């Protein structure tokens, strides 16, 4: 009887300890000062120096030769990051890698080292600029690599997600104009989304790049990728 009572008491003690520990863990996971967790959403635009909508034969011919550069842009409609309101602001990440980015085929590619430039909206305050750079580093962590430059400049982004007609102008450094893919853009009958977007997004769809490229400093090269099936339009919510 004494053994059973002791055993039950031990179980109750362990249960109480678990509840206390659980409560502590829950408290530790709560935002500081009972602030609500960050939520942020908006529109996303991406372009690469290779076709993302293509057939396997074309993709395998390009891998290792193209697709080492990319432009990723977020148009933040509403939300906060690390407690800083970023509603209405834009931020752009420009990437140069050592090999094809995001290749999902059987050929082994090693994109590292990666260098990048972050372009932040000139309308942002100092605190917002820091938060925009942090936002990019968190949500594009796999491809941000070594950030060699952060610059503030006027960034304009326009989205028509129905007709897939979008425009990005980041000063005189980054530019992208897209339209919907149509039948004449197909080169074979095996086209598919061969390369997924480089970051987590929602409702992504490939688009035709009318004009696009990077003409800024920091990456040791500039590039353009007009008239290619190389862009993505999407939304995001984190």
Residue ranges of model-derived segments:
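Bacterial N-terminal signal peptides that target proteins for export
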Residues: 1-12
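Signal peptide processing junction and immediate N-terminal pro/mature segment
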Residues: 19-31
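N-terminal Sec/ER secretory leader and immediately downstream segment
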Residues: 34-105, 109-117
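Processing junctions and N-termini across compartments
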Residues: 44, 51, 160, 181-182
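Sequence contexts marking disulfide-bonded cysteines in secreted/extracellular proteins
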Residues: 49-51, 56-58, 165-167, 186-189
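Short, surface-exposed beta-strand/loop "edge" segments at domain boundaries and coil↔beta transitions
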Residues: 77-85, 100-102, 123-132, 165, ...
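Extracellular-facing segments of soluble proteins and assemblies that are Gly/Ser/Thr-biased and enriched
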Residues: 98-163
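Extended, charged low-complexity segments
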Residues: 176, 181-238
């Amino acid at each position: 009887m004494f053994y059973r009572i002791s055993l039950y008491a031990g179980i109750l003690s362990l249960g109480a300890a678990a509840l206390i520990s659980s409560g502590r863990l829950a408290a530790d996971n709560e935002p500081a000062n009972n602030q609500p967790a960050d939520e942020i959403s908006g529109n996303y635009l991406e372009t690469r120096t290779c076709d993302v909508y293509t057939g396997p034969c074309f993709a395998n011919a390009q891998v290792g030769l193209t697709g080492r550069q990319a432009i990723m842009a977020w148009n933040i409609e509403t939300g906060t990051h690390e407690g800083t309101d970023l509603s209405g602001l834009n931020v752009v990440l420009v990437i140069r890698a050592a090999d094809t980015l995001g290749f999902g085929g059987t050929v082994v590619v090693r994109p590292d080292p990666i260098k990048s430039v972050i372009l932040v909206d000139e309308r942002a305050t100092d605190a917002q600029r820091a938060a925009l750079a942090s936002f990019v580093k968190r949500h594009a962590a796999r491809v941000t690599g070594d950030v060699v430059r952060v610059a503030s400049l006027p960034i304009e982004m326009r989205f028509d997600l129905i007709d897939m007609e979008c425009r990005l102008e980041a000063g005189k450094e980054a530019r992208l104009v897209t339209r919907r893919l149509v039948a004449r853009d197909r080169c074979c009958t095996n086209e598919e989304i061969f390369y997924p977007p480089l970051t987590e997004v929602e409702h992504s769809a490939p688009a035709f790049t009318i004009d696009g490229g990077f003409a800024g400093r920091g990456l040791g090269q500039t590039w353009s990728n007009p008239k290619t099936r190389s862009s993505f339009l999407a939304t995001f919510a984190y």
